[in-house]
Regions:
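Trp/Gly-enriched beta-strand surface patches
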Residues: 1-35, 94-98, 105
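Terminal connector regions
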Residues: 46-90
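Inter-helical turn/loop segments and adjacent helix faces that build the functional surface
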Residues: 50-55, 221-235, 292-312, 434
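Low-complexity, Ser/Thr/Pro/Gly-enriched N-terminal "stalk/linker" regions
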Residues: 71-122, 148, 152, 252, ...
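Carbohydrate-binding/catalytic loop surfaces
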Residues: 116-125, 166-206, 235, 260-281, ...
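Aromatic-rich carbohydrate-recognition surfaces in CAZymes
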Residues: 126-131, 135-261, 282-289, 417-440, ...
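Catalytic cores of carbohydrate-active enzymes
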Residues: 164-166, 287-403, 444-480
Length: 491
């Protein structure tokens, strides 16, 4: 094999994607393999200047160095994967959980779900909820990275208790003066410090609530109890203990409620396209209740009885409001618009049943047993498909700004009645909590990419990666998976 430089600038710099030989390596001679014969070749692809390329090429033109690097890479992942191994009769579950779901989670924590081979993306930095969700998946395999991400999120928390939905951790780092020009991002991001700290009306109401569980999981997994009392700055100035950051988050959600005691959706909740015109979110109220339970567990462990008792009373109030306002005969509604219309009711022609609110009613423990069973029965009846669970149904077809941008999304895609992967595990966990393991496994196998490899002409995506969504039944491409790795499902 002869090395061929990619066509580009004379100094081996950036290349043009439209150039005829862009991203192509060609063999200088034909390679013939006889039956059973093996030959080894070293294939190199990288980016950098000419000098860096020479150094790397020289090092890895040696098979011994290549083998050593490969062994180091193997050992690196073996150490991580060995922290959690399962053995079940389900081959797909074994393969995914023992290797690929951890790998996907590690990648997401590293790149905050914006590293993709197929999507350019429109952001840079850390997505608050994404990073908080991903951090809680790796305390056993990568506690250092888990803690780093948690501290960055704490730095990105405003003292009032809400997170900056998208921020760059470098904003809050003390940097030495440099004469070098800063990197010019192609993505539009806040350019002045005053633009970086948005007000509560632009906060996503669920963002910081995820961080409560991330912190508790980190402490439980590592035993790093002292972390709760570490002093960490706020995004808008001042500093406090990690423990007090958590209290600020809970207090913010307690304050940001509508007339009926249900948490306001603010800019949006987990479903960015369903903002209910700034109304109230059932999912966030259940998430608030769940975060309260996590915090109470930590407060009791730390013998901070007064805090534990206070937040138990808050939790009782949240649970009562959810029971009073969100139950609709057979399932939980999704929310209430700013104009007071309930969304996700039996009377709705579109968006009748939603996955998030029903799964979280059960997961949080806010639903009593009978309602929990009915809610998950509704999920099975209305939302289950052979490829996974729909986010909602029937799909929206009529634009309605009081509900949100979801009503303008093409039916069966993304938030509008697609099989959005991330909420599917919430349903698995909810069924496990109800003691209905067979239902959980039915849902698991439906979404599991391993079991979809024999229908690759439909799925069109890797058999080892959960994708952001699978096209729903209201679309002609029902079953097609899109945006691999761009999801928290792996956790």
């Amino acid at each position: 094999m002869k090395y061929r430089r990619l066509k580009g600038t004379n100094d081996g710099g950036p290349i043009c994607a439209n150039a005829p030989d862009a991203f192509a390596l060609k063999s200088a001679s034909k390679i013939t393999l006889q039956p059973g014969e093996e030959k080894r070749f070293i294939f190199m692809l990288g980016e950098g200047n000419r000098e860096a390329g020479k150094v790397m090429r020289e090092k890895y033109s040696n098979f011994e160095n290549v083998d050593r690097a490969f062994a180091e890479l193997h050992n690196y992942w073996e150490r991580k994967c060995s922290k959690l191994q399962i053995e079940t009769p389900n081959e797909g579950m074994n393969t995914l959980i023992n290797t690929w779901t951890l790998y996907q989670s590690e990648i997401n924590v590293m790149f905050s779900r914006f590293a993709s081979f197929i999507e350019v993306g429109g952001r840079t930095g850390l997505g608050y909820r994404d990073t908080a969700q991903d951090a809680m998946t790796i305390p056993h395999s990568n506690p250092e990275k888990c803690r780093q991400r948690i501290e960055e999120l704490l730095n990105g928390l405003v003292s009032k208790g809400y997170g900056l939905h998208l921020f760059d951790p470098a904003w809050f780092e003390k940097k030495e003066e440099t004469s070098e020009d800063e990197f010019k991002s192609p993505t539009v991001i806040p350019t002045s410090e005053k633009d970086r700290i948005h007000g509560p009306e632009d906060a996503c109401s669920d963002d910081a609530l995820w961080l409560i569980a991330s912190i508790v999981e980190y402490i439980k997994e590592t035993g790093d109890v002292s972390f709760a009392d570490k002093i960490v700055p706020y995004a808008d100035g001042g500093e406090d203990r990690v423990y007090d950051h958590m209290k600020a988050i809970l207090n913010f959600s307690e304050e940001q409620v509508g007339a009926d005691g249900i948490c306001k959706g603010l800019r949006a909740d987990w479903n960015d396209c369903l903002n209910l015109g700034g109304g109230e979110s059932a999912m966030v109220s259940f998430l608030h209740y769940w975060a309260l339970q996590n915090f109470i567990e930590l407060a009791e462990y730390l013998n901070r009885t007064e805090d534990a008792e206070h937040y138990k009373k808050v939790a009782e109030k949240v649970k009562a409001a959810c029971d009073r306002e969100l139950w609709d005969k057979e399932w939980y509604i999704r929310g209430i618009t700013k104009k007071g219309k309930k969304i996700g009711t039996m009377e709705d022609e579109e968006g009748k049943v939603h996955l998030e609110s029903n799964a979280w009613a059960v997961l949080s423990g806010a639903a009593d047993h009978d309602k929990a069973v009915k809610a998950m029965d509704a999920v099975d009846k209305y939302l289950y498909t052979p490829y996974g669970i729909l986010l909602n149904t029937p799909a929206y077809t009529k634009p309605d700004t009081s509900i949100g941008f979801i009503t303008k999304v093409y039916p069966g895609l993304k938030e509008n009645s697609a099989i959005f992967s991330h909420p599917n595990p919430w349903a698995w966990a909810a069924e496990c909590k109800l003691g209905r393991g067979d239902m959980a496994m039915k849902y698991y196998d439906a979404l599991c990419p391993y079991w979809q490899n024999d229908m690759i002409e439909i799925r069109e995506s890797e058999p080892y990666s959960y994708c952001q969504f699978v096209v729903g039944k209201d679309h002609t491409a029902f079953g097609r998976a899109r945006h691999p790795f761009m999801t928290g499902s792996g956790g």
